[in-house]
């Protein structure tokens, strides 16, 4: 369906949990262990109900996020049941990759088509520094297993000043021999991210163009989503840029979000929305739930205002919202 600005909203991002098995520095406090109690999370049946009603009004693609979605029990059955919904054309997962390698075959067999894996460095010591408790080899193993099982892979990378800027060329080489899309995501001022200085994607692109032959005269192509892509001569995969801060893409936004507690967010930045979990637990019918979702989608704001200090800003951390 369309929102009031005429954008076609066909993509649902739904967070299964705020829990994570890493503590990435720009996402979560080092010693954080105060997560949402299980009885406040949407149940898997509630999640499935939301997906069904969203599908009935035009949602075609579902992405499961977190926190780390793979720490949520029952995810295989959830994907299996979402895959049975006729209107849903694609099920995707955003993950840190630590647990994925040993699960991807089963996930794929039950309907998972794509994964986005967060990876900011190829150096073990830096990986430990940024994630605080992670192991790089597990992520690289997960990428390998995804390719073996024909699950399409995108790698999401955040470049931080004075941390991994010198690895840009090494990181894009992941897309050289493999059909992997690597996307540079500009750091957004959410939660712990406000404490770091990111690098703009225009600067990253200039670094790449100095060393690689960018095809199509360096012009970028926006596909179905916020990323603009370039092709590099000899590369099997593409390089993408998600530039939320320097190149607002809100006019093409096609998504709606639901947090682990069932709060439907119309925009990542804005705090407004409606709690679907509470409505369901109060006994509303499927038709009533559908109408609430339709109204929420229709009222989606025109754009974010990350660069402004707004009273309407969502103060929660990214892992609480759904990354």
From Swiss-Prot:
Record's catalysed reaction(s): GTP + AH2 + S-adenosyl-L-methionine = (8S)-3',8-cyclo-7,8-dihydroguanosine 5'-triphosphate + 5'-deoxyadenosine + L-methionine + A + H(+)
Q: Quick one: which residues bind [4Fe-4S] cluster 2?
A: 250, 253, 267
Cofactor, free-text remark? Binds 2 [4Fe-4S] clusters. Binds 1 [4Fe-4S] cluster coordinated with 3 cysteines and an exchangeable S-adenosyl-L-methionine and 1 [4Fe-4S] cluster coordinated with 3 cysteines and the GTP-derived substrate.
State the top-level EC class: lyase
Q: What is its EC number?
A: 4.1.99.22
Note whether Cell membrane occurs among the keywords: no
Q: Which GO terms describe its biological process?
A: Mo-molybdopterin cofactor biosynthetic process
- Give the cofactors, semicolon-separated: [4Fe-4S] cluster
**Which residue intervals define the domain Radical SAM core in the entry?**
4-233
Q: What pathway, per the record?
A: Cofactor biosynthesis; molybdopterin biosynthesis
Detail which positions bind GTP.
13, 63, 94, 154, 255-257
Record-annotated membrane-spanning stretches = none
Keyword terms, alphabetized: 4Fe-4S, GTP-binding, Iron, Iron-sulfur, Lyase, Metal-binding, Molybdenum cofactor biosynthesis, Nucleotide-binding, S-adenosyl-L-methionine
* InterPro entries (alphabetical): Aldolase_TIM (IPR013785), Elp3/MiaA/NifB-like_rSAM (IPR006638), MoaA (IPR013483), MoaA_NifB_PqqE_Fe-S-bd_CS (IPR000385), MoaA_twitch (IPR010505), MoCo_biosynth_MoaA/MoaC (IPR050105), rSAM (IPR007197)
GO molecular function per UniProt: 4 iron, 4 sulfur cluster binding; cyclic pyranopterin monophosphate synthase activity; GTP 3',8'-cyclase activity; GTP binding; metal ion binding; S-adenosyl-L-methionine binding
Kindly list the positions annotated as binding [4Fe-4S] cluster 1.
20, 24, 27
Q: What residues does S-adenosyl-L-methionine bind to?
A: 26, 67, 118, 188
Q: Which NCBIfam families match?
A: moaA (TIGR02666), PRK00164.2-1 (NF001199)
Q: What does this protein do?
A: Catalyzes the cyclization of GTP to (8S)-3',8-cyclo-7,8-dihydroguanosine 5'-triphosphate.
- Name the family: Belongs to the radical SAM superfamily. MoaA family.
Subunit: Monomer and homodimer.
The name under which this protein is listed is: GTP 3',8-cyclase
Q: Which organism is it from?
A: Clostridium perfringens (strain SM101 / Type A)
